[in-house]
Regions:
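A general structural signal for well-ordered alpha-helical segments in protein cores
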Residues: 19, 46, 72, 126-127, ...
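Rossmann-fold dehydrogenase core element
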Residues: 47-65, 84-87
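C-terminal helical cap and adjacent loop that interface with cofactors, partners, or active-site loops
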Residues: 208-239
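Contiguous beta-strand/loop segments that form the cofactor/metal-binding neighborhood of enzyme cores
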Residues: 126-197, 225-235
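Short strand-turn motif at the edge of the Rossmann-like AdoMet-binding core
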Residues: 37-38, 63-66, 91
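Predominantly a Rossmann-like dinucleotide-binding segment in NAD(P)-dependent oxidoreductases
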Residues: 69-138
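Hydrophobic residues in well-ordered beta-strands that form the structural core
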Residues: 35-36, 60-62, 191
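Beta-loop-alpha module in the N-terminal Rossmann-like domain of NAD(P)-dependent dehydrogenases
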Residues: 1-52
Length: 239
């Protein structure tokens, strides 16, 4: 009965492992779907959802909001004429659910049943930033501190590109106060964060600084919602 209503779009923010089945039901009912990141837990699930969306003339989106921020377009344009030497991206924040975990409970975000963990929750921001700015890596590795159920509490990854590497850190049992950095032959670009950039400063090898014109949206979801709405309106399936 829910999907018989006249709304156009459904936003699914249930535990990760439930995304696939719920999204398929919504798409089959002719509804556009926005899935909270990570959209699915297996690549083949995404492929099936994309096909279901096409079959029902619907759109499916992953709400990886930093990918759509205007800040990343500004950063990408700034880096266009520079030779990249590497980057360090991190997002680690002590989870509000850690006390529950330490008390012996297993919150959804730390559950293998629900495909939780640091990389799935916070690390995805670092991955999307890397793909947005540098493209798809040729190889990726991830080493993690894990619970007995195999879910990662924190970890470090390496994304390999032909001429450089991007190091990522994700954590839910630690907090990192470090900025993120992109290294070039001309100097270093420092970002205050990777998930909602408000400051980007380039420092050359002589110590001269250039502040990039970052205009942060008033709400963290403003830019991704605008992007999704425009794609639906224009029937544009390209990113």
């Amino acid at each position: 009965d829910f999907f018989k209503d006249s709304f156009d779009v459904v936003y699914i923010a249930s535990p990760n492992s439930l995304h696939f089945s719920q999204a398929k039901i919504a798409l089959s009912a002719g509804k556009h779907v926005i899935l909270e990141k990570p959209a699915v837990t297996q690549p083949q699930e995404w492929q099936e959802l994309v096909q279901t969306a096409k079959d029902n003339k619907c759109f499916i989106f992953e709400a990886a909001r930093n990918y759509h921020e205007d800040a990343f377009a500004t950063i990408k344009d700034f880096l266009a004429d520079k030779q990249i030497l590497g980057a360090d991206f991190n997002y680690a924040k002590y989870s509000s659910k850690m006390p529950n975990l330490l008390a012996g409970d297993t919150p959804n975000v730390f559950s293998d049943r629900f495909a939780g963990g640091a990389l799935m929750d916070l690390g995805i921001y670092t991955l999307y930033a890397a793909v947005r700015l540098f493209g798809k890596p040729t190889h990726a590795t991830y080493q993690a501190q894990k619970l007995d159920n195999s879910i990662d509490l924190n970890g470090d990854g390496i994304l390999s590109y032909p001429n450089y590497q991007v190091h990522i850190k994700a954590g839910k049992n630690i907090t990192s106060n470090l900025p993120c950095e992109i290294y070039t032959t001309d100097g270093t670009l420092t970002l205050d964060t990777i998930e909602h950039v408000s400051s980007a400063i380039f420092t050359d090898h002589q110590g001269n600084e250039v502040q990039l014109p970052i205009q942060q949206a008033p709400h963290t979801m403003t830019e991704e919602v605008a992007a999704f709405a425009n794609m639906i309106k224009q029937a544009d399936r390209t990113l």
